[in-house]
């Protein structure tokens, strides 16, 4: 797609220009897109102006001196209450008349803006429903009606001309200005009233995707009431407060601008406003942290307010110090982890119960230090006050007595610079990403080498951790304990200040250290000479400094993001639209306005919203740092999610030391990081941070690479390579510069993580080589012998009481026979092989159906699939195999990204429509017997095939019972000629070798030789295994002298052609699964021998098979067992695939090993700004076009990846972890 793709397509543009005027006016739909009778518009216009009319009545009565101010407002409010009741009553009556089913209000129904209504007359039900959709809940009808009356009455009082003249009389404002202010203010009131009582417009500032409880109608009236509340406070104040009067004058002017602010979406919805206000007060007023969930935020906010109130009422300064230190430490912990300990579950990556006594010892030490220093300071200050002669002696000698707080201030400055320097050394980049860290290891490929080269950095990180988490809190507590403002604690500001200060010491030691250092520097630089600065007290100074530091930091980040959008709109050729030059010129000409917008967004801690991600900047509405209303952990799961599920658990343990050592930089709530490993991209968000812990959310982005995804992923790789694998450039001055500085991503660190490494190979020359395929038959027989013998031994040694006919789980799962063996039956020493004459089953028809539909039983196929690209994510389907008893689920289909297996490329498509597949012989019913579909299922005549060996077999060794096989496995109806031809292929030497090895493993060195000799000389046992193994080989279809690649692949998938004994084999489900596993093992052995060389001895073959059984899952990506093996962290996984487009067979191997995951920091304000635009674009403009401009790849801003990482339903991460608690002390 080119850069000039439309921002909104034609359909959406028409939709937007119908919706936006409705938003501006608060609900009237004056542009419908179709013809409507004039009375529809008249109704809406009358209802819109009704509040002004009713308020005018009260105003007129007041101006005529008929009523005073209060009664004038009451009259207007009562009239509005009556009108609102009538309007809502009509709406509910019409809803009842037209039936129980009624359409949703327009604010919640996107289609309501597009429906074409047939109007019959002015009071018809459809007309009333169109003008006044009504409320869903009766409680809202009552609440909104009463609120509309109160709003109209208070607005009448608020906008009385006499009041406006008195408010602005001394400013020289004339009558014209007052009249204009009066008229425009009533327009604002009419907009708020209409959205409350008539019809609610869709707001540009939308936080929740669904307005379930009809909160949106309350947004605009609540802002109006907030403005009125300030004026009421001024009216009822005993003496005119200058600050309130100025505020009222300013708010009266802003009252006129409210419709513009609503239309631009700068004012938060009530739910977002409440959460944002609680978060800001908790962080900057009470010293807490942004919380990971809304419930935690509410509980922590209320608890912190209670602590501040209690601090105000504590009578002594010593009690204040001890109480605030203890409460600060307690609330800076994640107390929910105590519940985890009580439940008996070890906390995530924590110390368990050991953390409690350690924390108790530390807080006791902190309390002791604070109490002693405070008391000593009081004693010393008392002594200095009483002993004035000593002071005069100090002054006469020219030596000023040392101030304890000043000494501690210098110590804090030293700690700050040391910890900051040690933190800078931990990351790959320094000075905000502008330069590369020369001490960070480069071109490291293995985790072992990385650990070896970063040993010195880890020692520095441990030193920093000790200084920051142990020394700094104690020093800061000492600094605050000797503060002179503790003597004036019984003021609200100081009570809040000390509560916050002692909380920040624990909650965010690094931020608290920076703030105290700035306060100390200001004091040393002569801050006492600034008017009223010294009178504020240290703790209030800390509050102001923290706000300034945060807002300045936000301003710098937002300005950097704005410059990135501006510059790349021209420098990136694929982002350069025709309007780019015009927009750049406008931004340059209106540079002061741009800076004002950036400053305002920073001041409000609101996102800077680039409209359609163009250099057109707006102030988004303030919202919590998490940006989304829901609890983290929602995702759009797919089969590929399992890889992130395994990776996230390991990544969380690797993040802990990196966070603690400072490798991630200034890690605060709201920070975002991007992790990269092979084809996987991880989005790491910091949700919450406290003393010694951090709560993170890890998201996995889709593995299927779209074109946009590929462009940005390639740039991410370039950024990481420039930092971690860069080649030294000539010149001492510029060799350390970051070549990708200015990108939204700043490389931070490498993390050793135990993760699956993905390797794909094309099997051309291996799977189609006659030499290799000729060996497959022999390997299969050997593998099947080993599996059957091992199965019997494990049954016997386990001693369980289950029957041998129980279903065995699919190969590779941890519930397979190696983990959950089935016990053997106690049987006699003499085993009789029964002669059976069985009628041929009538189920050949459904076998034909099974064979021919095997490819269409996995998932969906679409003509839009990119056959040359990655595999599309499909919803998994279950494949059912019919047996005589029931239906058995074989597995749940999943697909590994990039896989070219036949089951994932052509899953449910009719094979007749795939002419390229016909030569492969797949699903065409080849080899099946001819049947007459018109006839009923009549039992076929008895078969003439009988068991070749009809004589009873006599075990000569008493230990042969251990290796006996179930009777059902010896009942195959196969022609004796087939088995006689294959009898020489039975590996007798291998059979004897396996017997000796298994006896050695089971019995040890005791009677090993005698038992082994007896078993090897037992011809009945060998005959039994010969018969069963060869029968399985024939039934599976693996008796071909030379396999074709197509037949090998079909047998590997368990979808081979119909054979004479296939029905018998599938009826014995357990034996079928063992046989299939043996064939898959033999295919893996074939691939290994072709790659690594042939197996040279029986002992090597035995060891190889044992390794397969213990450490490998060998099967299909579409098996549910594949997912289970990934979650259970099976060391290796192997699968075959078939690329139909290229005509090649492939292998895929996942190996679990420790690899280096690259992690970089993202511009958090850039992320918030793009998410704000996404919210506006999808929830308001409904611009969900998959090819829209704002979702196109942007290699500098990483726009496509950022949109993917948003919470559903706006984003689409395929995995999102619940909040993960990490202990980082």
UniProtKB/Swiss-Prot annotation:
Keywords: Glycoprotein, Membrane, Transmembrane, Transmembrane helix. The keyword Membrane applies. It comes from the Eukaryota. The keyword Glycoprotein applies. It holds the Pfam family Pecanex_C. InterPro entries: Pecanex, Pecanex_C. It is found in: Membrane. Residues 803-821 have a biased composition (Polar residues). GO terms for cellular component: membrane. The chain crosses the membrane at residues 40-60, 70-90, 141-161, 172-192, 222-242, 250-270, 272-292, 311-331, 347-367, 398-418, 466-486, 504-524, 592-612. Residues 803-830 are annotated as: Disordered. It is a multi-pass membrane protein. Glycans are attached at residues 383, 1173, 1200. Belongs to the pecanex family. This is Pecanex-like protein 4. It comes from Danio rerio (Zebrafish). The gene is pcnx4.
């Amino acid at each position: 797609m080119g850069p000039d793709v439309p921002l909104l397509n034609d359909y959406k543009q028409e939709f937007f220009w119908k919706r936006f005027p409705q938003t501006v006016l608060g609900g009237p739909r004056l542009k419908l897109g179709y013809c409507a009778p004039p009375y529809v518009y008249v109704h809406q216009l009358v209802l819109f102006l009704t509040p002004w009319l009713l308020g005018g009545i009260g105003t007129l009565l007041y101006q005529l001196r008929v009523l005073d101010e209060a009664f004038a407002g009451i009259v207007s409010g009562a009239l509005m209450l009556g009108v609102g009741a009538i309007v809502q009553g009509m709406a509910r009556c019409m809803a009842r008349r037209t039936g129980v089913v009624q359409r949703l209000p327009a604010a919640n129904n996107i289609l309501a803006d597009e429906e074409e209504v047939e109007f019959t007359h002015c009071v018809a039900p459809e007309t009333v429903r169109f003008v006044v959709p009504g409320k869903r809940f009766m409680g809202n009808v009552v609440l909104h009606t009463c609120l509309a009356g109160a709003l109209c009455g208070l607005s009448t009082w608020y906008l009385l001309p006499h009041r406006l003249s008195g408010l602005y009389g001394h400013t020289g404002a004339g009558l014209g200005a007052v009249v204009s202010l009066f008229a425009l203010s009533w327009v604002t009131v009419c907009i708020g009233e209409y959205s409350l009582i008539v019809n609610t417009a869709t707001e540009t500032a939308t936080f929740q995707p669904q307005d379930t409880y009809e909160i949106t109608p309350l947004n605009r009236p609540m802002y109006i009431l907030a403005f009125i509340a300030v004026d009421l406070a001024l009216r009822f104040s005993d003496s005119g407060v200058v600050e309130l009067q100025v505020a009222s004058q300013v708010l009266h002017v802003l009252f006129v601008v409210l419709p513009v602010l609503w239309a631009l979406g700068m004012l938060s919805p009530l739910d977002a406003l409440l959460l944002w206000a609680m978060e800001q007060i908790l962080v900057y007023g009470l010293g807490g942290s942004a919380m990971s969930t809304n419930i935690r935020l509410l509980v922590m906010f209320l608890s912190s307010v209670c602590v501040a109130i209690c601090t105000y009422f504590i009578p002594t300064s010593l009690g204040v110090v001890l109480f605030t230190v203890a409460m600060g430490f307690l609330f800076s912990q994640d107390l929910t982890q105590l519940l985890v300990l009580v439940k008996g579950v070890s906390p995530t990556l924590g110390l368990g119960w050991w953390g409690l006594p350690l924390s108790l010892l530390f807080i006791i030490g902190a309390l002791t230090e604070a109490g002693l220093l405070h008391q000593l300071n009081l004693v010393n200050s008392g002594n200095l006050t009483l002993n004035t002669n000593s002071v005069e002696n100090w002054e006469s000698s020219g030596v000023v007595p040392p101030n304890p707080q000043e000494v501690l201030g210098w110590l804090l400055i030293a700690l700050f610079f040391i910890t900051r320097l040690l933190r800078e050394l931990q990351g790959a980049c320094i000075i905000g990403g502008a330069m590369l860290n020369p001490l960070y290891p480069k071109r490291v490929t293995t985790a072992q080498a990385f650990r070896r080269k970063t040993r010195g950095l880890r020692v520095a990180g441990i030193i920093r951790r000790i200084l920051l988490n142990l020394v700094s809190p104690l020093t800061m507590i000492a600094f605050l304990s000797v503060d002179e403002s503790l003597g004036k604690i019984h003021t609200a500001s100081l009570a809040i200040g000390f509560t916050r200060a002692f909380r920040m010491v624990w909650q965010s030691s690094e931020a608290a250290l920076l703030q105290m250092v700035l306060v100390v520097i200001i004091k040393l630089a002569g801050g006492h000479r600034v008017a009223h600065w010294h009178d504020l007290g240290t703790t209030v100074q800390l509050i102001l400094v923290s706000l300034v530091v945060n807002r300045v930091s936000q301003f710098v980040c937002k300005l950097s993001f704005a410059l990135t959008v501006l510059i790349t709109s021209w420098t990136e050729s694929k982002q350069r639209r025709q309007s780019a030059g015009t927009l750049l010129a406008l931004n340059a000409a209106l540079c002061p306005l741009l800076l004002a917008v950036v400053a305002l967004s920073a001041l409000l801690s609101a996102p800077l919203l680039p409209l359609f991600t163009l250099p057109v900047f707006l102030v988004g509405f303030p919202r919590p740092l998490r940006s989304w209303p829901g609890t983290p952990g929602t995702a759009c799961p797919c089969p590929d999610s399992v890889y992130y599920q395994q990776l996230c658990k390991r990544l969380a343990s690797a993040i802990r030391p990196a966070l603690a050592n400072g490798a991630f930089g200034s890690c605060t709530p709201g920070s975002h990081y991007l992790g990269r490993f092979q084809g996987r991209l991880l989005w790491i968000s910091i949700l919450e941070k406290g003393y010694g812990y951090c709560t993170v959310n890890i998201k996995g982005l889709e593995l299927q690479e779209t074109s946009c995804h590929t462009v940005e992923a390639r740039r991410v790789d370039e950024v990481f390579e420039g930092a971690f694998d860069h080649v030294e450039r000539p010149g001492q001055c510029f060799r350390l510069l970051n070549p990708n500085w200015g990108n939204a991503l700043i490389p931070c660190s490498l993390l050793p993580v135990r993760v699956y490494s993905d390797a794909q190979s094309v099997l051309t020359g291996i799977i189609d080589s006659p030499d290799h395929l000729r060996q497959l038959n022999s390997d299969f027989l050997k593998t099947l012998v080993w599996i059957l013998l091992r199965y019997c031994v494990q049954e016997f040694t386990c001693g369980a009481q289950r029957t041998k006919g129980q279903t065995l789980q699919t190969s590779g799962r941890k519930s397979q026979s190696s983990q959950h063996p089935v016990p053997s039956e106690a049987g006699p020493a003499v085993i009789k092989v029964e002669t059976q004459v069985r009628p041929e089953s009538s189920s050949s028809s459904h076998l034909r159906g099974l064979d021919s539909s095997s490819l269409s039983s996995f998932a969906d196929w679409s003509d839009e699939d990119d056959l040359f690209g990655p595999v599309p994510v499909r919803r998994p389907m279950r494949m059912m195999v019919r047996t005589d008893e029931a239906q058995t689920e074989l597995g749940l289909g999943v697909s590994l990204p990039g896989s070219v297996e036949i089951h994932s490329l052509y899953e449910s498509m009719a094979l007749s429509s795939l002419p390229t597949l016909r030569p492969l012989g797949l699903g065409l019913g080849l080899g099946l017997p001819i049947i007459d579909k018109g006839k009923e299922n009549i039992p076929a005549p008895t078969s003439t095939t009988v068991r070749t060996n009809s004589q009873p077999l006599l075990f000569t060794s008493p230990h042969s019972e251990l290796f006996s096989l179930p009777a059902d496995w010896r009942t195959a109806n196969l022609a004796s000629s087939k088995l006689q031809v294959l009898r020489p292929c039975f590996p007798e030497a291998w059979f004897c070798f396996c017997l000796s090895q298994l006896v050695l493993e089971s019995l040890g060195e005791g009677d090993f030789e005698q038992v082994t000799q007896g078993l090897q000389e037992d011809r009945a046992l060998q005959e039994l295994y010969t018969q069963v193994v060869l029968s399985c080989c024939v039934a599976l279809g693996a008796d071909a002298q030379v396999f074709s690649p197509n037949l090998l692949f079909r047998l590997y998938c368990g979808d081979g052609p119909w054979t004479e004994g296939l029905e018998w084999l599938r009826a014995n489900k357990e034996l079928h699964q063992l046989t299939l596993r043996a064939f898959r093992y033999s295919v893996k052995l074939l691939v290994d021998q072709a790659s690594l060389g042939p197996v040279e001895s029986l002992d090597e073959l035995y060891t190889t098979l044992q390794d397969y059984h213990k450490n490998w899952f060998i099967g299909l990506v579409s098996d549910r067992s594949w997912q289970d093996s990934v979650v259970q962290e099976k060391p290796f996984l192997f699968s075959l695939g078939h690329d139909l487009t290229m005509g090649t067979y492939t292998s895929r191997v996942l190996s679990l090993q420790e690899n280096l995951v690259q992690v970089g920091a993202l511009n958090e304000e850039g992320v918030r700004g793009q998410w704000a635009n996404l919210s506006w674009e999808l929830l308001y403009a409904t611009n969900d076009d998959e090819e829209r401009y704002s979702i196109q790849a942007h290699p500098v801003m990483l726009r496509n990846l950022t949109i993917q990482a948003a919470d559903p339903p706006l984003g689409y991460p395929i995995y999102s972890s619940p909040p993960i608690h990490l202990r980082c002390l």
